[in-house]
Amino acid sequence: MEECSCDNRFRRGNNEPAGFSLDEQWWAGNIRLVDLSGQLLGAHIAHAGLIAFWAGSITVLEVARYVPDVPFYEQGLGLLPHLATLGFGIGPDGTVVDTYPYFVIGILHLVTSAVLGAGGLFHTFKGPAILAEGGALAPKFHYDWGDTKQLSLILGHHLLLLGILCLAFVAKAMFWGGVYDASLGTVHTVSPNLNPADIFGYVFGFNHGQFNGLGMSSVDNLPDIIGGHVYIGILELIGGTWHILTKPFAIGAKPFSFSGEAILSYSLGAVGWMGLLSGFFVRYCDAAYPPQFYGPERSGAAAVQYILGVLLLVGHVWHATRARAGGEPVPYTPPAPQRGRFGMTRVAPAPARTFIGRGKPQPEPPKKKGLFGRG
């Protein structure tokens, strides 16, 4: 079997938007991996490792510089308030009595980042560039952007994971030590409010029957917050199971594009919308962001959420426009095996492609002639 050059592992794909040239775009990132399911998986895992490394390292750094007699928000700490809100390290009177749990959580994130980083490196340099060409179970996880069934399967697993994590937060609040209650200034377990009229009323701007323009961010008690997470977790588990077992209906899938850039635009739109919503929670919801930890004035932190949300929505429009102009995705076709010398089977080499940072397709290096003029 012929060897594949290192550059060919990052070869340009068939599903890049029309008019796009990697040679002319210095900011091109993972779009060069759009047709390489194995390489894109490696980038995805490595990205998760970077996020875990950031969270772990910043947590350990904040523990090292924490001053007990000064509130979190006056020290400019960003992650310890979140851990304190979850009830870690807080005494009966609502003050921080132990920072060791914060240190342990930071170290666990660093260990997790090392594992994820190793996985990202494996899939980048050792694993198959395209999962369909790998051995063992790798082909089972290959996907094409035009294969709506496989994409629905991937979405379903993501929803299942989110649902499990959401219900884990509920279990922490109900059984595993409780969470911090800003109204009482203590940590205690919470019994969720499961009244659907109360919980879903927030979606339409009603706080227990009274209209409030702040909508969901007007929630002012922990039972409603935990009850809302119960419903969200259950809905995500149902949605995840649904998407794993089904594929998009023709009438529902028709208005949508399923190219890589289109799915990126959908993700950016969802995260951007959540960024705008979270800004209202940061600014106005003391039950979710206790002023004892985050400060009574949180407009600056909320402004950061608004700015990031708007930037992500702009990215959504940008990538959605490019996806609409790019046409339908091209399905993956595995290379056809060819019969070589002595009846041995070899895989046909990949066609010449434009590599990142190169202006033209790179020709094959000339073969050196050996003894008697043989190649």
Swiss-Prot record:
InterPro entries: PS_antenna-like, PS_II_antenna-like_sf. This is Chlorophyll a/b light-harvesting protein PcbC. It is a multi-pass membrane protein. Belongs to the PsbB/PsbC family. IsiA/Pcb subfamily. Its cofactor is chlorophyll a; chlorophyll b. One of its GO terms (biological process) is photosynthetic electron transport chain. The lineage of its organism: Bacteria, Bacillati, Cyanobacteriota, Cyanophyceae, Prochlorotrichales. One of its GO terms (cellular component) is photosystem I. Chlorophyll a. Chlorophyll b. Keywords: Chlorophyll, Chromophore, Membrane, Photosynthesis, Photosystem I, Photosystem II, Thylakoid, Transmembrane, Transmembrane helix. Signal peptide: none annotated. Pfam families: PSII. It is found in: Cellular thylakoid membrane. Coiled coil: none annotated. It comes from Prochlorothrix hollandica. The chain crosses the membrane at residues 40-60, 102-122, 151-171, 225-245, 262-282, 300-320. Its main location: membrane. The antenna complex consists of chlorophylls (a and b) and chlorophyll a/b binding proteins. Residues 352-375 are annotated as: Disordered. It comes from the Bacteria. The antenna complex functions as a light receptor, it captures and delivers excitation energy to photosystems II and I. The Prochlorales pcb genes are not related to higher plant LHCs.
